[in-house]
């Protein structure tokens, strides 16, 4: 009898061992996976680890030190006949705008044209910013979300002709051309830029062209090449104050180098030069004022102020959200310093309603009158000062 029970008992023990061996690791694995997933969800973020200020005995959810987004920085969904028409045209003309790709909050204002205008009138008063030379930059500024590479794709030799043809058929009265930095090219893309502008002017002389360029690695001959291509406005952004430039912009960009670009453009006979400053990155009032004075020394005509908005968590944090009243104050300060036109507000960007400014202020002569008025006031103050000293 024992001879028959032994195999049965052995089989029972073997089955029990196999069952235990097959279920225990799976159960343990599931438990470990759940614990790991829970730790990832509730644990510190990458920013917390980089900062190194998270205590070992507690978990911090998110970035508690970051300022909350104010309500005045939230915008409504853009609408309107002019906006819809321009968006539809873009698809058919195969043009790429910074307005859409950067999700600019002012797209409704710039593409919407004037209130109450017809579709054609709205389109002629609208402003759009076209990106040239690809979508990959050779620089890596800490505020910018454009992708970067040391070896971006080669230029499209047909882009100047195709862009000019598309823009001439588009019907806009004002166009802004910009590009990524191309330090991989011998001329930084200056000839490509200049050729595009020249072809636009050949096909549609009535279209006003603003070129928002990089610094061409400080090569002023390349700046001159673009400045003499037939454009109406030369723009180059200093982005921030001099003291913060090394921490905000790519190491190859300097404040003084940017000033030299704007100075050379004016020396080449460009009527209007323009730049832009982000606020909320840690600047002081004295630093902003000094930057404005330096810009006036090189005869910059237009300046815009806007709030820095963090594109992703990989980019530098917002130091603070600047109140609208402070933007209004900087507008007044800049105008008092002699700038022809100042656009200042939390949502303002470099090309904010650029066409409206140019048409209303430059072509109608308002800028000339304002410049004469400022010079007259300066002359009167000088005379009073001289009389007082006597």
UniProtKB/Swiss-Prot annotation:
Broad class of where this protein is predominantly found: mitochondrion
One GO cellular component this record assigns the protein to is: mitochondrion
Specify the pathway: Protein modification; protein lipoylation via endogenous pathway; protein N(6)-(lipoyl)lysine from octanoyl-[acyl-carrier-protein]: step 2/2
Q: Show the Pfam families listed in the entry.
A: LIAS_N (PF16881), Radical_SAM (PF04055)
EC number(s): the record gives: 2.8.1.8
**This protein's record includes keyword RNA-binding:** no
User: Which keywords annotate this record?
Assistant: 4Fe-4S, Iron, Iron-sulfur, Metal-binding, Mitochondrion, S-adenosyl-L-methionine, Transferase, Transit peptide
Record-listed [4Fe-4S] cluster 2 binding positions: 137, 141, 144
Q: Give residue ranges for domain Radical SAM core.
A: 120-340
Spell out the PANTHER family in the cross-references.
LIPOYL SYNTHASE, LIPOYL SYNTHASE, MITOCHONDRIAL
Protein name in the entry: Lipoyl synthase, mitochondrial
